[in-house]
Amino acid sequence: MSFAREAGRAIRSTLVLWVITALIYPFSMIAIGQILFPWQANGSLITNNQGQVVGSALIGQPFISDRYFNSRPSTTNYSTADPKNDPNKVLQTGISGASNLAPSNPALIDRIKGKPDPDPAKAIQGEIPRLEKGAIKPTAALVYTSGSGLDPHITPEAARAQIERVARVRGLPTNQVEILVTKNTDERFLGIFGEPGVNLLKLNLALDAIANTR
């Protein structure tokens, strides 16, 4: 068999595979996603009552106000930064990850328990003292960071620990806030995989929706 014939066969095979893998397959997946799962395929975006996109159900956001259920700590601050001071281009490229600190690491212990210092700029408040100051029982999800730093969920236990504070600050009945927590809790996938989690963005938007109807 001549070299030209072998080369021609190789070129044809390459072109066929290229058309299948680079054109037919990806565009088929895009079409299937847009037809069957349009919300998920477009990023699971969440809008407010005005129709404005406020985030994604898959990406967490930092919530620290007493009026809201607070998010869990994040080593990347949920990939947020000051638009006027962003030398690492976090807002442009995004960033995720964990601290990977060992349980015995002093930096992790200081972040959790706090570290007083005569110089206020060097003092570390600590997650546990911050929670106790707000009359919130510390739970693992409110003290430790997640592996990605972008987790959109907190545990039902972490949400329940904040119910009284949120209800008090907003002047809402405790049972009404409890119902919101239950409604915004995602159960185990297929009933067996993973653990239940409360989607924080959905829950806090539901709180604002109540405030707008009062």
Swiss-Prot record:
The keyword GTP-binding does not apply. InterPro entries: KdpC. It is a single-pass membrane protein. Its main location: membrane. One of its GO terms (cellular component) is plasma membrane. GO terms for molecular function: ATP binding; P-type potassium transmembrane transporter activity. The chain crosses the membrane at residues 17-37. Keywords: ATP-binding, Cell inner membrane, Cell membrane, Ion transport, Membrane, Nucleotide-binding, Potassium, Potassium transport, Transmembrane, Transmembrane helix, Transport. It comes from the Bacteria. The keyword ATP-binding applies. It holds the Pfam family KdpC. It is found in: Cell inner membrane. Signal peptide: none annotated. PANTHER family: POTASSIUM-TRANSPORTING ATPASE C CHAIN, POTASSIUM-TRANSPORTING ATPASE KDPC SUBUNIT. The system is composed of three essential subunits: KdpA, KdpB and KdpC. Part of the high-affinity ATP-driven potassium transport (or Kdp) system, which catalyzes the hydrolysis of ATP coupled with the electrogenic transport of potassium into the cytoplasm. This subunit acts as a catalytic chaperone that increases the ATP-binding affinity of the ATP-hydrolyzing subunit KdpB by the formation of a transient KdpB/KdpC/ATP ternary complex. Belongs to the KdpC family. This is Potassium-transporting ATPase KdpC subunit.
